[in-house]
């Protein structure tokens, strides 16, 4: 059994604006549609309906709906899906606040260079035990902690 496309439009016709198509399949041998007797109706086997992408009008209706529990991250009355937060792992009060992992901390017990190489990072009395000061209190915040400066001026409403 062969199937033919009963779509009579030329192939150069552009697609419908909504991207939908309908093809009707008929059974029987392929025949020349121009010489076909009009009294002989082809038997319809099935109809295939294809639906493409949504139209521009339908796409513009899709909006994000925020739940009431969504956090206003910037305090400006705007709710956003792109949230820039820095997670600081909770630590015990006697833990170091440096960002090194346990493996890096254990590596600090090994001395690969002269004590002069580590003079800025360790105090002489605790050399080989632990890091006492990596970043001073006067150090500038990193790019994630700093408040971005915007060229645009914000209006207070």
From Swiss-Prot:
GO terms for molecular function: protein phosphatase 1 binding; protein serine/threonine phosphatase inhibitor activity. One of its GO terms (cellular component) is nucleus. Residues 11-29 have a biased composition (Polar residues). Keywords: Nucleus. Residues 1-76, 92-157 are annotated as: Disordered. The keyword Transferase does not apply. Transmembrane segments: none annotated. The keyword Iron-sulfur does not apply. Residues 53-63 have a biased composition (Low complexity). It is found in: Nucleus. Residues 1-10 have a biased composition (Basic and acidic residues). Regulator of type 1 phosphatases which maintains protein phosphatase activity under strict control. PANTHER family: E3 UBIQUITIN-PROTEIN LIGASE PPP1R11 (PTHR20835:SF0), E3 UBIQUITIN-PROTEIN LIGASE PPP1R11-RELATED (PTHR20835). Belongs to the YPI1 family. This is Type 1 phosphatases regulator YPI1. It comes from Laccaria bicolor (strain S238N-H82 / ATCC MYA-4686).
